[in-house]
């Protein structure tokens, strides 16, 4: 039997959940097998992310991706024809070399990632395996999920500076049972917000976007909703935040402008401590300091690493070199993993391996601009990612990922393990 090789790589411009253009890629093998992938994009982006190539000009507000599409259909297609789709490192290395820039700025990370993901999907189909099994083998775990149910910052047009308020099931049950708890709290939260007099319109990630006065009010609403849904805060359902501090950090004065206050590093830590003391079910914070505020992040890590999970997003941008730097500096204790921040499946896996090797937890993440693509659901299971965040249990581009996880759990059977919150974080 002849070994299948890549016969054709084709891309087209489609649209994401925010109505912005993005890239869809089809990789066709010599035996007719086709793998497909759709690339997400972020609203809150780190300075060191791989370059998402946009066309500029007047068409579609300058956000068109036809240049990236054309790069796939010409240069990348020509370079990958005849290559083995099962050799993911070689596929990705070929595209990186072809691009020739340190940030994938010539061909576009959105072009390269689409091909990288679609190739993995084609290879899995060629092996007659689901993607999670092809990438991950046999020793698999279902991830613990984090759900952004109150949106602020860059994800909503309201007065809340902190970007995401998430809930996560910590009771040791099946993924389905945990997700049902989340759905119950989500619907309860809607009523709680209505009773508080707030609008319940949705933000980019399916969470509510009430025009609240401050973050404390958002946390109180979550706390009340958990209880009213019949659960115990911290025991059944916990809370996590993505602070996205780079978006309220002022580069001119080197301080944090948060909720009408101007705070130093130390004062910001005091602000966080107040929230942690008032809401002990708050167990994880992402990007509590600006991505360039190394001193602030390191000091916060030193004083809080045994109390909460400190997730690095903009600080490392899923880049193994930046993660290695953060590890040596002593910043954070967990890595947020976004495929489109680095731009290939292979490099993403490298960052995950480096995280694990150094005792950092990993959280696989969606982006605010999503599609119906479910790659990250399979990916989170395949790499035993431990944690996954993909928005609220609302809006189809978010729920698609969770529905895919329900399918995977059904396929794996009840004998498979469920990943829970890391043991090094004390929920008491």
UniProtKB/Swiss-Prot annotation:
Cofactor note: Binds a second Mg(2+) ion via substrate during catalysis.
Keywords: Cytoplasm, Glycolysis, Lyase, Magnesium, Metal-binding, Secreted
Protein location: Cytoplasm; Secreted; Cell surface
Reactions the enzyme catalyzes: (2R)-2-phosphoglycerate = phosphoenolpyruvate + H2O
EC number of this enzyme: 4.2.1.11
Region spans: Disordered: 38-58
Gene Ontology biological process terms in this record: glycolytic process
Binding, Mg(2+): 242, 286, 313
Gene this chain is encoded by: eno1
Binding site for (2R)-2-phosphoglycerate: 163, 338, 367-368, 389
Catalytic residues, chain numbering: 205 (proton donor), 338 (proton acceptor)
Cofactor(s) of this protein: Mg(2+)
A Pfam entry, by short name: Enolase_C
Name of the protein described by the UniProt record: Enolase 1
